[in-house]
A protein has these predicted regions:
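Substrate-binding strand-loop-helix patch
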Residues: 146-153, 172-190, 203-209, 242
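NAD(P)H-binding glycine-rich loop region in Rossmannoid oxidoreductase-like domains
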Residues: 5-66, 70-73, 88
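Terminal hydrophobic/aromatic helix or amphipathic segment near a protein terminus
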Residues: 182-231
Length: 256
């Protein structure tokens, strides 16, 4: 599967890496020795979809800590971790709590470190494109909050550049700022469709979280991050040269 680009546009890597190891951080035996012979660790591990067996704590904290423990044991020279932007505005969200617990562990580890905080990925906005293709998008809230998401390749360069320098946190956004509603409209235009967006009040989404939590706590925890993030702006310092409009156009070309 590493010989072809991934579903979010990530490049094939089979011919540019020395070794590929597949493991499960919730099964420690599968990642034993993962940092042996490694100088620098780049870690972007996180739970992004519902899992019936594992929580954000299991993956975002414990899973990352298992990698960190081995990095400490192997005396790696630097540990680069990709976390979340605006974490201070969402401290009670389970996903954020787990990521930030790990950030605390990293800072206490005595390893040289950097924490990268992207505000949103083009691949996240790609979900709007998928919905726009169906001809209709449900939008939670008024869609007036702003974001400047970043392309994965531009974020990768920020991570590599963070190898040198002091221990620090780096907030990262892309070159273009849109409201959430504007990103949806951009997706519709890329599909060649007239925007059809139905607004759902925030109270309805929050009520849905409560009901969902009665049946599926893990799903509700992940959804709570998505809902909470729609309540404020996510504008971070601009990095990179790739534009969301072009990303949507590329998705449209593939679909055709």
């Amino acid at each position: 599967k590493f010989k072809t680009p991934g579903s979010h546009g990530e490049p094939a890597v089979y011919d540019i890496v020395d070794e590929i190891v597949t493991g499960d951080v919730t099964s420690p035996e599968t990642i034993a020795g993962i940092c042996k012979g490694i100088d620098i660790v780049f870690c972007a591990l996180g739970l992004t979809s519902p899992d019936a067996r594992h929580t954000s704590y299991d993956v975002d904290y414990l899973g990352n800590k298992r990698i960190l423990d081995q990095a400490i044991e192997e005396h790696v020279s630097r540990f680069i971790y990709v976390s979340v932007f605006n974490q201070d505005k969402m401290p009670d969200i389970p996903t954020i709590k787990s990521h930030e617990l790990f950030v605390e562990e990293l800072k206490k580890s005595r390893l040289s470190w950097a924490v990268i905080r992207p505000n949103g990925y083009f691949s996240d906005m790609g979900r709007f494109f998928s919905m726009a293709q169906s001809g209709h998008i449900f939008m939670v809230g008024e869609g007036d909050k702003k974001i400047n998401p970043v392309h994965g390749a531009d974020l990768a360069k920020v991570c590599v550049d963070a190898v040198n320098g002091d221990c620090r946190e780096i907030p990262v956004g892309g070159p273009d700022i849109y409201t959430f509603k504007e990103t949806m409209e951009l997706a519709f235009h890329a599909c060649g469709k007239t925007p059809w967006i139905t607004q759902l009040p925030m109270w309805l989404a929050e009520g849905g979280l409560i009901v969902t939590g009665l049946f599926n706590r893990n799903l509700a925890d992940l959804m709570s991050f998505a809902v909470e993030a729609l309540k404020f702006d996510h504008v971070a310092p601009s990095y990179g040269t790739r534009h969301l409009k072009d990303f949507f156009a590329e998705l449209a070309a593939v679909k055709h």
